[in-house]
């Protein structure tokens, strides 16, 4: 065997070993570009263990990891999108729906589940961004209303994880109508004295941010989530001014009072559970106090000398 044949044999052996590694074992962080073991990333709830970058998460997995195991019931599964306008751009709307259902594995862009969080009854919903950019159409609006109705019926809180590009253009005015429809439903929830916690994840834009996503009794942002209405370039072209760096990130919004807090995804169950327990006066042994300093003495109103 010549020296050239030996080299070729070794290279073939190495390439065959590489080919034996199945796809999906490794992935790369979209922020620090660190190569990560996919199973480890899943265990860490799609948060990079190297730089803590919060990657986009599937809606179904988000709800399954957020709610307690067992007793989870999905709502609104009978609702499916329809092409009532026979809309066509570069593709027919029907074709876009079929492609999105095939790629995402979901019927539409919102999943609603009823279950428990740390032993407390809860209704939770999450947007699936891989389904047409998490856009809000008639089915999304109808499912969200079902979530509100279920929360009212069970006298419990509602939590929504938003990840959307906004209203679905293929449904025209019917998609814009969902902004008013979901807002009106939340007003009914508020009248019953039940809390709505909105968790804004990356990205939350357009008609969703301009309606239900910003109507929470408490608005929570994930770290470095993109949150806004129009994109940076559109705004700059409209106002003809340069905008500050990161002005649509959750940290900037928290600093300027647009959201109430930023919570790491890995702490979301306990933080949201603690908030709901406080807001509903629910006693649960699984809930850890949301107070950062539980040993701190409670604040007392100072007495005022009325004579002086």
From Swiss-Prot:
Chief subcellular site? cytoplasm
Q: Which cysteines are joined by disulfide bonds?
A: none
Region (Disordered) location: 288-308
Residues that bind Zn(2+): 29, 32, 48, 51
Query: What InterPro entries does this protein's entry cite?
Result: AcCoA_carboxyl_beta, Acetyl_CoA_COase_Trfase_b_su, ClpP/crotonase-like_dom_sf, COA_CT_N, Znf-ACC
For this record, the Gene Ontology CC terms, alphabetical, are: acetate CoA-transferase complex
Q: What is its EC number?
A: 2.1.3.15
The record describes the protein's role as:
Component of the acetyl coenzyme A carboxylase (ACC) complex. Biotin carboxylase (BC) catalyzes the carboxylation of biotin on its carrier protein (BCCP) and then the CO(2) group is transferred by the transcarboxylase to acetyl-CoA to form malonyl-CoA.
Please give the name of this protein: Acetyl-coenzyme A carboxylase carboxyl transferase subunit beta 1
Which source organism? Vibrio parahaemolyticus serotype O3:K6 (strain RIMD 2210633)
Q: Which gene encodes it?
A: accD1
């Amino acid at each position: 065997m010549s020296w050239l044949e030996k080299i070729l044999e070794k290279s073939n052996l190495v390439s065959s070993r590489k080919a034996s590694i199945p796809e999906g074992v490794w992935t790369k962080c979209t922020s620090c570009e660190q190569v990560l073991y996919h199973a480890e990333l899943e265990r860490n709830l799609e948060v990079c263990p190297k730089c803590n970058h919060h990657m986009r998460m599937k809606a179904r997995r988000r709800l399954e990891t957020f709610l307690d195991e067992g007793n989870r019931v999905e709502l609104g599964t009978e609702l499916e999108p329809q092409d009532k306008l026979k809309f066509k751009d570069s593709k027919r709307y029907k074709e876009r729906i079929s492609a999105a259902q095939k790629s995402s594995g979901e019927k539409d862009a919102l999943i609603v589940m009823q279950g428990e969080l740390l032993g407390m009854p809860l209704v939770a919903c999450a947007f699936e961004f891989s389904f047409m950019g998490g856009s809000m159409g008639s089915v999304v609006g109808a499912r969200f209303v079902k979530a509100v109705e279920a929360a009212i019926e069970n006298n419990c809180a509602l939590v929504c994880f938003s990840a959307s590009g906004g209203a679905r253009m293929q449904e025209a005015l019917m998609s814009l109508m969902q902004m008013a429809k979901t807002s009106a439903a939340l007003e009914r929830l508020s009248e019953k004295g039940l809390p709505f916690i909105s968790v804004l994840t990356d990205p939350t834009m357009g008609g969703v941010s301009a309606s239900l996503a910003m109507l929470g009794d408490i608005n929570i942002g994930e770290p470095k989530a993109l949150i806004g209405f129009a994109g940076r370039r559109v705004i700059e072209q409209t106002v003809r001014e340069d905008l500050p760096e990161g002005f649509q990130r959750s940290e900037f919004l928290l600093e300027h009072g647009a959201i109430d807090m930023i919570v790491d995804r890995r702490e979301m169950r306990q933080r949201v559970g603690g908030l709901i327990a406080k807001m509903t006066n629910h006693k649960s042994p699984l809930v850890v106090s949301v107070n950062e300093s539980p040993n701190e003495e409670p604040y007392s109103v100072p007495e005022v000398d009325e004579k002086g």
